[in-house]
Amino acid sequence: MNAANIFRNCVQAIRQGVLIEREGANDKEFHFQNWFRKRLEAMSLNFDSPGRNTYPDFCLVHSPEGYELKGLAYPGREADYDCNSQVPRGEHNGRQVFYVFGRYPTRPDGNRYPVLDLVLCHGSLLNADNTYEHKNKSFRGFGSYGDILVRDRKMYVAPTPFALAEGTAHRNTLILRDTENPGPGFVPVGTMRRREVDQIVVTYNFDLRSNCLETTTAPNPNAGLEHIFVAYRLEGDPLDPVSLRPREHILSELESSATCGDE
């Protein structure tokens, strides 16, 4: 597993003041990716270069691991992020998937600015199901003349580790499954247990007359199953604890974020 060493390299770069460099004010997508790319290159890790629609963003060549990057402006939206058409997961096409969340200043005074804090986590912290397959569907027949096409293009929004875990803000944190050992140089600062819900959404229906969306649930075959994660810090960093927020607090913050996004 390369995740721990990649995290170490990222933290060392942050400590050394290695800045994000954007090409211009309109570069809102690739600047953090480019910063991370340089960390992989510094480690001489071979990877497939990311494309606009590839998932995850970086796939290692000699190890079945992938890294999905999410840059977040701070202060700003931090409770959730747009997954677009890819539900977060911990495994994809035989690769273990890790997510890298980095926050940077919302209004930098130039095109070079620091990584404020960073979380590298296993994707199963965000969602434990690796079986769901996203597909876009459509039908024709809508409208007065029955010739308008309706596309069903699902877009997903998931919580960030900053919303899930207390103690991640303003720190650099590695979060792994409890079965994974990061090796020497890492100090555990918290254990988190995410419990699968009793009912999961299996269908939804959208009424074109009322613009109402309704969901149908079914029993979760893994109801009550706990997924255990351990948070680590690199030696030399602050060791204040990391803990999972209560579920009601997480949902409340996500609802608040969704309401602000709809305004």
List PLM regions with ranges.
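Nucleic-acid endonuclease domains
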Residues: M1-P56, V61, G71-E263
